[in-house]
Amino acid sequence: MKIELRRARQEDREKVIEVESGATPNLSYLANVFDMFLSEKSGEFIVAEVDGKLVGCGKFTKMPDGSAWLEALRVLPEYQGMGIGKCFYKQFFDIARHRDVTTMRMYTGVKNAVSKGLADQFGFNVSAAYRGAWLPCPQEAGRDSTDTFRQVTDPDRATAILMPFFEKWTGFLVMNRTFFALKPALCLSLAQKGCIYEDPRSRSVITLGARFMPEQALHIGVFGGDTEACLEFAAKEGATKCTKRLSCLFPPSAVDLQDILTHNDFRFEASDFIVMTVHC
């Protein structure tokens, strides 16, 4: 059996979608992000072939803070357990060395022993746990009581109002199940993308955005202050943008956040997620 890894090409699209359909039938999004993954200069989209057959894929993405995010690692079920996942990880470490990346991260479900076990073998350690919550967006924007929220585009102001969330949110801000390290570099990036909102009157702050597929979900990264006003504003933005749902990943240790989300009729994912880190 000959395993070869190479960069993905446009003509791999259908095969990559087939791999995802077989490997993770309950988590399918590569059809929507294939072109983005292929064109991103901040990362490398890789496929695995066994004796010339495309059987796996994986993505290495450089993050705003200079770390790397490992994602979309998929292998056809009939080819799992043959060392293909290990080949991807070895390739990720090679890319990291070539790109001067010293920290890599990935996420998985707390019940996914195989995914965690593979990361364990390569020195990854659990950094934090997160719980997912979601709420269908209203079809129409609500009342105008949240019109005092304004976008924050100044990097210094963005850093000043977001970094205090670091401890409570255990160091990460999550969008599209991508765990961004909450650092000044991320604050700058979010400010540039128009994802930060502040209501100076009530000292409320919320981040809203999507790394991809904004029509599917508007992601709440962090929020605080008048939490009811924050969530009302998020619902209004979701309706305005015609997105299907609001999504929020938060630390289970923040019991007050779960209470707030529960009170606002959010539904919770069946199991939690973990983010794992390695320094290389």
Question: Which residues does each PLM region occupy?
Answer:
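Conserved acetyl-CoA-binding loop-helix of GNAT-fold acetyltransferases
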Residues: 75-77, 81-95, 117, 121, ...
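A conserved beta-turn-beta hairpin within the catalytic core of GNAT-like acetyltransferases
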Residues: 62-70, 80, 208-221, 268-272
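Conserved catalytic-core motifs of GNAT/GCN5-like acyltransferases
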Residues: 62, 105-108, 125-139, 265-279
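Conserved GNAT acetyl-CoA-binding A-motif
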Residues: 68, 95-111, 241-251
